[in-house]
């Protein structure tokens, strides 16, 4: 493999620590061509679709990418804002707020946001951090619960970038934070604020993104981590277990996924006479297609059509202060031992560069 050329090494340059926040991704616009590009990248990832390539790729390019882009584009159009894709907007706001919050706490680190699929890509943002002087980078996926299809795929993208890079910075990775006290606190405050404004429903449904059931048997901890998040949140809200339901959404394909499925569960609740439900999505840290369209629109319609009377979708953590504080705490723990609070000494850097030139360095 050919490694990308690097600028000539310069002595006396300031070394900085950085954080790369990574979310799933989004198309560039809500159009069929943009969705075709996005879905081709997303669904070609062997972490996402664990089917032999020789079987899956003809199906993907011969069937899925001919039909799905137009349907998905219409769904994205229903949630698109003047600022763009909600997921990208919220993720970039989180990066900006985290930069400020860490700076206020004495950690002036660089923070950038990347998308695993789409733009800005992981590789693009890692290159940008290097260009800004980052020599130590913490990779922090915005997935609280670990799954091979999400968290590990982010790591794959970083490893692929590193394999092409000549001078690789020090790298650290955050694996998960499904039981982090700050994360649970932020979720609890988010739901409590909703209750203060709208009252409390008869049931709280916690909907997580689904994955194929067989991944649980193959050793993926995702299901267990979702359940632990739900248990800790239930305790934080002082609810009884029977008042909370854990469900899984966004099933793709015909294989059995983690159950119970969100929409059928909501229909059953309505048919059982449960007239008011609240739905929150703890596994999503930013509102996106899966929350704003699949839950707030489609699931709501299904519940009301089945006889339910009041459906409230509780927004994701987005730019809530408690969430940014939790992200900051998570980052600081994983940055331990790196000089995040040491400001470069210009005089010392100049002296270092001078000594190097005296020994024959060119820069």
UniProtKB/Swiss-Prot annotation:
GO biological process: heme biosynthetic process
Pathway: Porphyrin-containing compound metabolism; protoheme biosynthesis; protoheme from protoporphyrin-IX: step 1/1
Disulphide bond pairs: none
Gene Ontology terms: cellular component: cytoplasm
Binding, Fe cation: 209, 290
Catalysed conversion reaction: heme b + 2 H(+) = protoporphyrin IX + Fe(2+)
Keywords: Cytoplasm, Heme biosynthesis, Iron, Lyase, Metal-binding, Porphyrin biosynthesis
Subcellular location per the Swiss-Prot or TrEMBL entry: Cytoplasm
Keyword Cytoplasm: yes
Molecular function (Gene Ontology), one example: ferrochelatase activity
InterPro entries associated with the record: Ferrochelatase (IPR001015), Ferrochelatase_AS (IPR019772), Ferrochelatase_C (IPR033644), Ferrochelatase_N (IPR033659)
E.C. number: 4.98.1.1
Pfam families in the record: Ferrochelatase
Recorded family membership: Belongs to the ferrochelatase family.
HAMAP family the UniProt entry points to: Ferrochelatase
NCBIfam families in the cross-refs: hemH
Function, as annotated: Catalyzes the ferrous insertion into protoporphyrin IX.
Record protein name field: Ferrochelatase
Gene this protein is translated from: hemH
């Amino acid at each position: 493999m050919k490694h990308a050329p690097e600028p000539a090494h310069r002595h006396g340059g300031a070394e900085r620590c950085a954080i790369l926040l990574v979310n799933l991704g989004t198309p560039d616009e809500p159009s069929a061509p943009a969705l075709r590009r996005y879905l081709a990248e997303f669904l070609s990832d062997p972490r996402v679709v664990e089917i032999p390539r020789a079987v899956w790729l003809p199906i993907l390019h011969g069937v899925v990418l001919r039909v799905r882009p137009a349907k998905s584009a219409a769904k994205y159009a229903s949630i698109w804002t003047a600022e763009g894709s909600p997921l990208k907007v919220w993720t970039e706001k989180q990066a900006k707020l985290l930069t400020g919050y860490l700076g206020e706490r004495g950690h002036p680190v660089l923070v950038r946001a990347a998308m695993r699929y789409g733009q800005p890509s992981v590789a693009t943002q890692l290159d940008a951090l290097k260009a800004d002087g980052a020599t130590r980078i913490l990779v922090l996926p915005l997935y609280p619960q670990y799954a091979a299809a999400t968290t590990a795929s982010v790591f794959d993208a970083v490893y692929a970038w590193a394999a092409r890079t000549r001078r690789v910075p020090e790298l650290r990775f955050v694996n998960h934070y499904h039981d982090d006290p700050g994360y649970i606190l932020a979720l609890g405050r988010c739901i409590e604020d909703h209750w203060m404004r709208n009252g409390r429903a008869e049931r709280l449904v916690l909907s997580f993104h689904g994955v194929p059931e067989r991944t649980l048997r193959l050793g993926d901890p995702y299901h267990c981590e979702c359940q632990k998040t739900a248990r800790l949140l239930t305790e934080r809200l002082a609810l009884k277990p029977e008042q909370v339901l854990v469900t899984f959404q966004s099933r793709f394909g015909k294989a059995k996924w983690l159950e119970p499925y969100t929409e059928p569960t909501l229909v059953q609740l309505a048919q059982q006479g449960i007239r008011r439900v609240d739905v929150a999505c703890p596994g999503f840290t930013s509102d996106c297609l899966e929350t704003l369209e699949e839950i707030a629109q489609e699931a709501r319609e299904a519940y009301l059509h089945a006889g339910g009377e009041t459906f409230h979708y509780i927004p994701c953590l987005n730019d809530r202060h408690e969430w940014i504080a939790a992200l900051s705490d998570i980052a600081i723990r994983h940055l331990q031992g790196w000089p995040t609070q040491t400001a470069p000494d210009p005089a010392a850097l100049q002296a270092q560069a001078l000594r190097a030139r005296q020994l024959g360095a060119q820069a």
